[in-house]
Amino acid sequence: MPEDYWSAKDYQRNASFVPKLTKDIVKRINLSSSDELLDLGCGDGVLTNELVSQCRRVVGIDASPDMIKAARELGLNAYVIPGEKLLDASEIPSESFDVVFSNAALHWIMRQPKNRPIVMKGVSRVLRTKGRFVAECGAFGNVSEVVGSIYSILLALGATKEQIDQANPWFFGSEDDYTRMLEEAGFHVEYVENISRPTLLNKDVREWLDTFAQHFYHAFPQWKDIIRETVYNALLVTDCRSDGKWFLQYRRLRFVAHKE
């Protein structure tokens, strides 16, 4: 089990915008009252809980024990299962769901190249024939100003690119990346797009980093404060409006595929 850097309280304080910006992808699930849905990377369960009334059964899984604790406190049926373990997870029977849904999670789950086909096969295993895989995640180019700043700072401080790559917790794939991976796992891709979605932060980019960039802090603890303050000062120019509101340049990859 990977180390758990997540805090449900911090997430709700600094990233409550995440479940609020899901209207478009939730529409594409096209849920019916008879559907059984698995939420892959359910986090604190806030969005998952909104889906409960729309279908027959909802189950959530996530790699973070703290997030699953928060999801269970909402009354959800949720398990600590990393995405790459779904293929063999005894808690989740094969062909037991009509829909696998994932929001803002695949760019974490798919970070390691070796895990990508395993995750896709796991999703296929738990879906019934013609079942749907509907997801939104960080796309190629997502928060590129943040990623570029972090790499530039750490390279200037003496870290190697290989060390930074090892610390980087994200995989922001392209439409072609996901189409290929889905098709190789036996899915038919009905829809895929990469869209721009500038996103208003709850506070400033430092709190965003504290929530989402913990992996860099833990890999380079001696430079945590430098990363935090230098990214803040650099992005004041590009991502902070004159009224003090911060917008990061999010790009989202959305897809709908079904198991053949």
Swiss-Prot record:
Single GO molecular function: S-adenosylmethionine-dependent methyltransferase activity
InterPro entries per the UniProt record, alphabetical: Methyltransf_11 (IPR013216), SAM-dependent_MTases_sf (IPR029063)
Swiss-Prot/TrEMBL GO biological process terms: methylation
Superkingdom of origin: Eukaryota
Subcellular location per the Swiss-Prot or TrEMBL entry: Cytoplasm; Nucleus
Keywords of the record: Cytoplasm, Methyltransferase, Nucleus, Transferase
Principal localisation: cytoplasm
Enzyme class: transferase
One Pfam family, short name: Methyltransf_11
EC number in record: 2.1.1.-
One Gene Ontology term, aspect cellular component: cytosol
UniProt xrefs under PANTHER family: TRANS-ACONITATE 2-METHYLTRANSFERASE, TRANS-ACONITATE 2-METHYLTRANSFERASE-RELATED
Family note: Belongs to the methyltransferase superfamily.
Purpose of the protein: Probable methyltransferase.
Protein name per Swiss-Prot or TrEMBL: Uncharacterized methyltransferase C70.08c
Lineage, highest ranks first: Eukaryota, Fungi, Dikarya, Ascomycota, Taphrinomycotina
